[in-house]
From Swiss-Prot:
UniProt-recorded name of the protein: ATP synthase subunit s, mitochondrial
Main location: mitochondrion
The keyword Metal-binding is assigned to this record: yes
Encoding gene, per UniProt annotation: DMAC2L
Subunit structure as annotated in this protein's UniProt entry: Homotetramer. Associates with ATP synthase.
The LRR repeat ranges on this chain: 62-87, 88-116, 117-141, 142-173
Species in which this protein is naturally found: Bos taurus (Bovine)
């Protein structure tokens, strides 16, 4: 397990180097492997542990309910009773999470905050999938989407399903074209939402 964690961190670090076009296929394949959902694992260890493993494998961080410290090292995931560690916040900055992995989040009941920053594989379908998860519709309070170039108006509008969302920050999203339409949509669907935009 420790070896896998170190190798995955090293491989994720290599993605920042300039590569030929052919290497993109390799990284796409490797990221798909990191994102693959293992339903047996979810059943065996519970949704929070399985989602933690997925997120950290892909370079994200998690914070558990009642803790201040962010968990970012795959090799130091806490052990103990399956129901002890519940994910409260996710910071997916520079991670390789993608839509095929989002089934990991289906059983999460306590996630209040998600930060998606510089996530090259996040697209509208990911946001639509997230917003359809009933547990997240109830628990989500804050969301930040920053520098995710594949996100468009369609994906942002889908977030109105997070009926308890209190804060949404959107920045550097070149695919988002109709700011005023988004503002009006959220004013109608989530009138108490604090919406902050830093879009061109």
């Amino acid at each position: 397990m420790m070896l896998f964690g170190k190798i995955s961190q090293q491989l994720c670090g290599l993605k920042k180097l300039p590569w030929s076009r052919d290497s993109r296929y390799f990284w796409g394949w490797l990221n798909a492997v990191f994102n693959k959902v293992d339903h047996d694992r979810i059943r065996d260890v519970g949704p929070d542990r399985a989602a933690s493993e997925w997120l950290l494998r892909c370079g994200a961080m998690v914070r558990y309910h009642g803790q201040q410290r962010w968990q970012k090292d795959y090799n130091h995931l806490p052990t103990g009773p399956l129901d002890k560690y519940k994910i409260q916040a996710i910071d997916a900055t520079d991670s390789c999470i993608m839509s095929i992995g989002f089934d990991h989040m289906e059983g999460l009941q306590y996630v209040e905050k998600i930060r998606l920053c510089k996530c090259h594989y996040i697209e509208d379908g990911c946001l639509e999938r997230l917003s359809q998860l009933e547990n997240l519709q109830k628990s989500m309070l804050e969301m930040e989407i920053i520098s995710c170039g594949n996100v468009t108006d369609k994906g942002i509008i889908a977030l109105h399903h997070f009926r308890n969302l209190k804060y949404l920050f959107l920045s550097d999203l070149p695919g988002v074209k109709e700011k005023e339409k988004i503002v009006q949509a959220f004013k109608t669907s989530l009138p108490s939402l604090e919406l902050k935009l830093d879009l061109k």
